[in-house]
Each structure stands twice: as C-alpha cells, then as structure tokens.
Amino acid sequence: DRFAYSTSKGAVYTMTLSIARDYVKRGIRANCLCPARVHTPFVDNYLRENYPGKEAAMFSELEATQPIGRMAKPDEIAALAAYICSEEAAFVTGAAFDIDGGFTLLK
C-alpha cells in the first residue's frame, strides 16, 4: 500500500501546482496541506483491530516517530486550513504546507 499512498500524495501536490498555475490570473488560489499522522478514530480503530491488547504501546510507538512527540490533532489541521482560506493568506498560492510536527525536515 505504500506505493499507492506515496503516489497519491505526490499527485495531490502536483495537482495543486497545476491548479495554482491555471487559475492564478482569475484570482483563484490553490494550496495543499501535507499532514503526518493525525490522531483520529481511524487510528484508534486500526490499533484496536490490528494490535488487540497492545493498543497503548503501539500508540506510543506511533507518537514516538514524530519529532514533536505526538500526533497532530484534527483541530490543528483545521486551523491551518482555515488560515489558508482566509484573506490573511490572500498572497499564498501554489504552496504545500508540511503540518507534520517536524517529520519531514527534522527526522
């Protein structure tokens, strides 16, 4: 599944650049968020189904892979999305925001 996941991530980034180039003259901005692990019910369900009785240990292992020491919270991702859509970010287009607790650059 790593191949499909990586390909999809790359596709979102290049699609963002294409949209930004194609629509910038119309005043339409395009940016993308590139999060690392986000603590959602999906993570909890995955751990429960795949590591019964070891969920807490596996959760700690997942968090330890993040330089910041934890997974993102959905509200943190939403806050960046709200900013990108706001007038405060009116000069931002064609950008990819790594919101990953340092995973990309500090790992």
Region annotations inferred by a language model:
Residues D1-A4, I19, F42:
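Conserved catalytic loop/helix region of short-chain dehydrogenase/reductase
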Residues S8, T16:
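Active-site helix of classical SDR
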Residues R21-K25, A90:
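Alpha-helical segment proximal to the catalytic Tyr-Lys
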Residues K25, R37-T65:
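A glycine/serine/threonine-rich, flexible loop-to-helix segment
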Residues R29-H39, C85, D98-D100:
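Conserved SDR Rossmann-fold cofactor-binding beta-strand/turn motif
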Residues K54, Q66-I77:
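A conserved structural motif in NAD(P)-dependent oxidoreductases
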Residues I77-A78, I84:
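Non-catalytic, hydrophobic alpha-helical segments
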Residues A82, T93-K107:
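Short C-terminal tail/terminal secondary-structure segment
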